[in-house]
C-alpha cells in the first residue's frame, strides 16, 4: 500500500506545483503594449440614406460652390461642387466630434474648426480644442484650448486674420476646464481669456457687429449634466457686450426675465445692426423671444417662443428682411414680424431636428439646413427640399452582424433615425449604395441582434416614438 500512497502524494505535489506555476505566470503577466490598427485598411460601407446629425455649415462667400459641413460625431466634410460630392477632411485628427466650422473672411483657404459638439444631450461627445487649416482642409494643426471639450462658435476679424474669438462652452459633465471667451491676436498661437463668469459657466455664442468689429456680444450659459439629471441654467447665464474688442464687458440683461436663465441664442440683423434678436430659456417658464432695437442696451419681449437649451436654441436672422428670423428646433419655425408670431416653415419630405442654417445673402429663399438627418437644400423657402443623399455620417448606437452567405449583413440602431441593415459587400463593381440598405424598424433605433442560425430573424430595440 505504500507505493500507491507515494504515487498519490507525488501526484498531489505535481498538481499543487502546476497550480502554483500557473498562478505565478498569471501574476507575472504584463498588460499588452498599445496595439496600433493603422495597418488595417478601412472601407466605407455607408449608409447615407438617412445621413446624420449636422452641427454647423460654412459657405465660401467667394466661391459658393464650396462649403464645409461640421458633423456632431463624424468629423468635417467638404464639397467643391455644391454637394455633388463630399470629402471627409478631418479623419486623421484626434477628435471626431465637431461643434463648429468657420471660414476666414480674408482667406478662404484658412479654416477654423471647434471640436466637441455644442449641444448638451447625454450622447454628446467631447473634443480636444480648436484646429486650424491653411490649405483648405488638406492639413490641420491643433491650436490649443484642449480642455474646453465643447466649442460654441468661432469668429475671425473681417480685416485681420490674426484676431480670432472662440466661445468655449467648457466641459459638460464637470466643472472647470478651458471655459469662457478666448481671444488670439497672433493667429491662434496664444490665447487670452477675455470673458469669464465662473467654473460652471461657459460661453455658448459670440457675435460681432457687422459694421464695427470692436463691438462684441456674448451669451453665457451655466449648465451641468449628471447621470441622474441635467442642470440647464443658473445665475451664470446671461448676455454681455464689449465696445473695445473684448477689453471690458458689461452685462446687458435689462428687460430679460428677472429669474435664473438657461441657454440664450443670439443673432444680429444683417439689415440693421441696431436690431438684435435673442431666444431665451428661463426658470419658471418665463423664457421667450426678445428683440433689442438699441444694440442690446435693453430688451423687449415679443412672444413666449423658446426651444430646448439642451438640444436647440439657435436662431438665424434673415440677410434681407429685417423682421424675419428662423429658429432651429424639432420643427424649424420662422417669424416674419420680428418675433411676435411664429409658424413652421414646412418640412414635408424632410428630416426634422434642426441645428444649422445658411441663408444665401443675395437670395433669401435659398437655404442650406443641417439637421439630424443630414443636409437639405431649398430654393423656394421650404416649399421643396433637396436631400443630399451622399453624406454617410449616420450615428450608430450599436451594430451587429449576421452569418448570411456569401456576404454577411450589418445591422444597427441609429440616433434620431431608423434601425437599419445593409450588406458588407456586393457582387458588382459599383460597390455598396444607399439602395442596398434597408429599414428594419422606426427610430430612434438602438440595438439589433440577429439569430446566428437564421439571418432572417432579427431582434430590435427602439426608443422614443419608434412604434408610432
Question: What are the functions of these language-model segments?
Answer:
Residues 1-25:
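Bacterial Sec-dependent N-terminal signal peptides
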Residues 464-468:
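A short, hydrophobic C-terminal helix/tail in secreted or cell-surface proteins
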Residues 22-463:
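Beta-propeller blade termini and top-face loops
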